[in-house]
Amino acid sequence: MTLVFQLAVFALIATSSILLISVPVVFASPDGWSSNKNVVFSGTSLWIGLVFLVGILNSLIS
């Protein structure tokens, strides 16, 4: 169970880092938002899901 928690935390950190870099790049590009809107929303949904998953796993481990 601890390994699953560690992998979930790693995935959350990796997704946060990717979104931290990619979202400003999408907003700065001329047609970036209209062409990459679905990718940004998918990444944000993944991030929110990982936050809840890490919270649930943390309550099970502690």
Swiss-Prot record:
One of its GO terms (biological process) is photosynthesis. Keywords: Chloroplast, Membrane, Photosynthesis, Photosystem II, Plastid, Reaction center, Thylakoid, Transmembrane, Transmembrane helix. Its main location: plastid. It comes from the Eukaryota. It is a multi-pass membrane protein. It is found in: Plastid, Chloroplast thylakoid membrane. GO terms for cellular component: chloroplast thylakoid membrane; photosystem II reaction center. May control the interaction of photosystem II (PSII) cores with the light-harvesting antenna, regulates electron flow through the 2 photosystem reaction centers. PSII is a light-driven water plastoquinone oxidoreductase, using light energy to abstract electrons from H(2)O, generating a proton gradient subsequently used for ATP formation. The gene is psbZ. Belongs to the PsbZ family. It holds the Pfam family Ycf9. This is Photosystem II reaction center protein Z. PSII is composed of 1 copy each of membrane proteins PsbA, PsbB, PsbC, PsbD, PsbE, PsbF, PsbH, PsbI, PsbJ, PsbK, PsbL, PsbM, PsbT, PsbY, PsbZ, Psb30/Ycf12, at least 3 peripheral proteins of the oxygen-evolving complex and a large number of cofactors. It forms dimeric complexes. It comes from Jasminum nudiflorum. InterPro entries: PSII_PsbZ, PSII_PsbZ_sf. The chain crosses the membrane at residues 8-28, 41-61.
